[in-house]
Amino acid sequence: MREWFTRECDPIQKVVDGLDIGWGGVQRWATARMPPPAEGLHLDIACGYATFLAHLGWRFPTARLVGLNIDFDGPHRLARPLLIEAGVTAALVQADARRMPFADGTFGSASCFLGLQDIRIGFGEEGMRETVSEAMRVLGSGGVLALLDEFPLERFDALLDGLPLAVMDRGERGLDVRWNRRVAERAIALYTEGWVAQTRAADRTAQEQTCVEVHGQMTAEMERQLETRGYYVPFGPVRMVVARKVR
């Protein structure tokens, strides 16, 4: 599937974009560690390209999957053809994760893979809290919620504090990725563009300021890693919290 996903890319961008398929082994690790989706529907929140949905479908072929994303335009237009290429059946719903168009208790289980960080960029800390609250609302009693992101575990604890959840598992996994400077510099340019788009800022000056700040921060981290490690790992480690709704 990686070859299909990157078929129109030049050799360097093929490496960068190919990370979305599997995330350096993290998606395979996550689905192996997650409990099987409950009977009924499983919701993947902020599903983006739908690569995690594909891994869920491969790992749990009988699961009834639904992916929700704020848009399926631009890069995310590949979500539907990607699922077809993967041989995975899933319904895709375009909606804001902070205001999900589902009745209470619709889903038996839910997940969010690296989606909270994008929601934070666009809608701040409050947007993340609203998303987790909505996930709880649409999750049935006894349903399982799996959250995966780069945040420290303490930040997950703060997000879940006060909610009727019992934590079942915590885990951490680094990306099996080692990039040289040429790949890293191309990646940083692409990631900066993506970050600016996620802010949804209409003001051109604000966009340019964000671009300069984010590119500078990412470049500094790249230089640090190249000096200390000799290679660049663009993200991670990814941390996972799995919790069950207790009422």
Give, region by region, the residue ranges found by the protein language model.
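Class I SAM-dependent methyltransferase SAM/SAH-binding core
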Residues: Y49-R99
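Conserved Class I S-adenosyl-L-methionine
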Residues: R173-R247
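A short acidic, Gly/Pro-enriched loop at the edge of an enzyme's catalytic core
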Residues: R98-A110
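Class I SAM-dependent methyltransferase Rossmann-like catalytic core
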Residues: M1-G25
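Conserved class I S-adenosyl-L-methionine
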Residues: A38-G48
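Conserved alpha-helix/loop element of class I SAM-dependent methyltransferases that forms part
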Residues: D20-E39, H55
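A short glycine-rich, Lys/Arg-flanked "PGG" loop and its adjoining helix->strand segment in the class I
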Residues: E126-S141
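Conserved beta-strand signature within the Rossmann-like core of class I S-adenosyl-L-methionine
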Residues: G142-D149
